[in-house]
Amino acid sequence: MLDYDEVTAFLGEWGTFQRLIFFLLSASIIPNGFTGLSAVFLTAIPEHRCRIPDTVNLSSAWRNHSIPMETKDGPEVPQKCRRYRLATIANFSELGLEPGRDVDLEQLEQENCLDGWEYDKDIFLSTIVTEWDLVCKDDWKAPLTTSFFYVGVLLGSFISGQLSDRFGRKNILFLTMAMHTGFSFIQVFSVNFEMFTLLYTLVGMGHISNYVAAFVLGTEMLSKSVRIIFATLGVCIFFAFGFMVLPLFAYFIREWRRLLLAITLPGVLCGALWWFIPESPRWLISQGRIKEAEVIIRKAAKINGIVAPSTIFDPSETNKLQDDSSKKPQSHHIYDLVRTPNIRILTIMSIILWLTISVGYFGLSLDTPNLNGNIYVNCFLLAAVEVPAYVLAWLLLQHVSRRYSMAGSLFLGGSVLLLVQLVPSDLHYLSTTLVMVGKFGITSAYSMVYVYTAELYPTVVRNMGVGVSSTASRLGSILSPYFVYLGAYDRRLPYILMGSLTILTAIITLFFPESSGVSLPETIDEMQKVKKLKQRQSLSKKGSPKESKGNVSRTSRTSEPKGF
């Protein structure tokens, strides 16, 4: 039976057409790098203290001592959520009493910030935190906003594949790109926290949907050898490039509305790609639109300077060229992921693996404001370190076993994060460097986990297995802002938690089967056994009948993109 790759082999693998598709689709991901982690600057919390109204009659001495002091990470700093009772200190000021000399400040009654807060503007002129006072009793709202963005990503993950299967890769790519850009633009005019959060959720839905559509379109149009590079390096590196440019925008534009507008506008420019990116011929064939697919392929041949055959698709073979996804396989359900002890343990381990990697990746990215040093430089470095991480992951996938590659990357990331707490407070650059190395290790693991998981599950439930694992990843990203939030109580706590979880997961990874150089399993019974189950199941088989393989159908071996 013919297949699409054989029929279109005359186009070559890396002609002008393929290069255009590779770079244009990768470039369409750059705006995702802007919005994916824009919360680092949009929801940043500047230094703040209770506002003392100018109308209150206080001497300069009492105005300077109106805020109680507290010890935090060594030195004494003004409290952020309390002040001395204004009526009391105003009375002392009127009587001519001096703070500290005539009045014991530790005995004074305190009150909340009844008149709002004053925010330091050395780094940020405004953020949503300063505009809507999302501090103190409302400090949970800023991480909630970020979590809702990732809730949108979770929802978009569920619908994007179904929409592109029904309406076409190109249509959904540009529709969700418009959704991503449009709601981000409306977000600029948010009048309150609730409106901003709702729109941020919708932005998250468009964000992941156009990412997935671009990924699928590229993998369907590029040859086998090129699509591997596109999936592991192309879209990931261009996302990282957008992430690297984000702090440059933020450095020059320090007011959150103008910054959001600036990082939204490049998405408008991507609309021009409509006239350069064609629909997926594979999808057109699956819909029976053979003539349209031929037109695209002949145009590709012309761009590559190749003369196309007089007949590309033989009508008698048209049905055989349908994607496997268009065939109706025997029904399998989510229950199949826990049907046998082996696949049940593998599924649980995969959920833990994906959840932990996602918490580490997004937690470290969102924790940028809490790092010592310049926030803009730190953000750039955390983005730049992803590029060599992706390259390393690609090399490891080519030459080293999957299990040890994953475990090694996670051990590296987790161990250096645990070392952060041991660094003396005056060695800021060392602690920041360790965080960068931790991000490097976790990013490498994130880049490999899609491939590894897809290879472990059998064809009949592969999409479900990767889908459930990917859902765990989304849940990890939703939780990650609250790992960062814990840093308000102790700056070392996020690193201790993320480092411990990452090392624990690295140990769990060592019990996964090895998939490198092994044929992909087609049925549940063909799956490799999880470590420690091999011996137990081999013994049990001596006294029990083998599991029935049943009638299963073979579906396409697919993998999904790393989701941001």
UniProtKB/Swiss-Prot annotation:
Tissues expressing the protein: Predominantly expressed in testis.
Transmembrane stretches, start-end: 21-41, 143-163, 173-193, 198-218, 233-253, 258-278, 345-365, 377-397, 410-430, 434-454, 466-486, 492-512
Extracellular side: 42-142, 194-197, 254-257, 366-376, 431-433, 487-491
Parts of the chain on the Cytoplasmic side: 1-20, 164-172, 219-232, 279-344, 398-409, 455-465, 513-564
Pfam families: Sugar_tr (PF00083)
Intracellular or extracellular location(s): Peroxisome membrane
UniProt entry tagged with the keyword Transmembrane helix: yes
Major location (coarse): membrane
GO biological process: carnitine transport; monoatomic ion transport
Molecular-function GO term, any one: ATP binding
PROSITE patterns hit by this protein: MFS (PS50850), SUGAR_TRANSPORT_1 (PS00216)
Sugar-bearing residue positions: 57, 64, 91
Region annotated Disordered, chain positions: 532-564
Keywords: ATP-binding, Glycoprotein, Ion transport, Membrane, Nucleotide-binding, Peroxisome, Transmembrane, Transmembrane helix, Transport
Family that this chain belongs to: Belongs to the major facilitator (TC 2.A.1) superfamily. Organic cation transporter (TC 2.A.1.19) family.
PANTHER family: SOLUTE CARRIER FAMILY 22 MEMBER
Protein name: Solute carrier family 22 member 21
Organism of origin: Mus musculus (Mouse)
Lineage: Eukaryota, Metazoa, Chordata, Craniata, Vertebrata
